[in-house]
Amino acid sequence: MIERLLLTGAGGRLGSYLREPLSKLCTELVSTDIKSQIGSLYKNEKFVSADLAKFDEVLPLTEGVTMICHFGAVVDELPFDNLLGPNFVGSYNVWESARKNNVKRIIYASSIHAVGMYSKTKTITPSTHHKPDGFYGLSKCFTE
């Protein structure tokens, strides 16, 4: 069983779907989102509202964490300035705070938008070069 798991983006589409099953896999689930609330909490879950673009809010979240599921990001194609904080700086802050606090494992969800502009008939493999289809895809490349 995972001792302490940090879930970023807990109020988003993927995070809200995974909260319950993840709560069954760990002793303590620390859920975070930029939203001020995410609804009812599971018995071993605590919620901390935080802005991933602010390192001083992310660093304490990773203290004593065994594993991070990093799903916190803006998932829409928007102008670069709208994605810079949450997707680029936020992801950097998660990885850097994990490094500083010796977190051993991070699970990250990428996107087909990172690989991007290939024909539907091309087989995509781990060695396929990135061709992001926009700033959202570029943010996924950056985090990978």
Predicted stretch roles:
Residues 50-86:
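NAD(P)H-binding glycine-rich loop region in Rossmannoid oxidoreductase-like domains
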Residues 93-135:
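Conserved Rossmann-fold NAD(P)-dependent oxidoreductase catalytic core, especially the SDR/UDP-sugar
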